[in-house]
Amino acid sequence: MISKEKIARINELAQKAKSNTITDEEKAEQQKLRQEYLKGFRSSMKNTLKSVKVIDPEGNDVTPEKLKREQQKNNLH
């Protein structure tokens, strides 16, 4: 997970970009930080989805087969 300081820096750079006072160096830093943030977010989202079980209104397990295989591989369900 990305630190609070890095998130604050991302937001600071976003404000500078909105006011058109951002330098090329800061743009590169902003891109690097955004990529780091997105990588962590995607990883977290994948882990969350791996623990999901989908049940229809009749109580049947309708979890997609691909997800079931991934869960079995990781011994989650």
UniProtKB/Swiss-Prot annotation:
InterPro entries: DUF896. Residues 63-77 have a biased composition (Basic and acidic residues). Pfam families: DUF896. Residues 55-77 are annotated as: Disordered. This is UPF0291 protein RBAM_017680. The keyword rRNA-binding does not apply. The lineage of its organism: Bacteria, Bacillati, Bacillota, Bacilli, Bacillales. It is found in: Cytoplasm. Keywords: Cytoplasm. GO terms for cellular component: cytoplasm. Belongs to the UPF0291 family. SUPFAM superfamilies: YnzC-like. The keyword Cytoplasm applies. Its main location: cytoplasm.
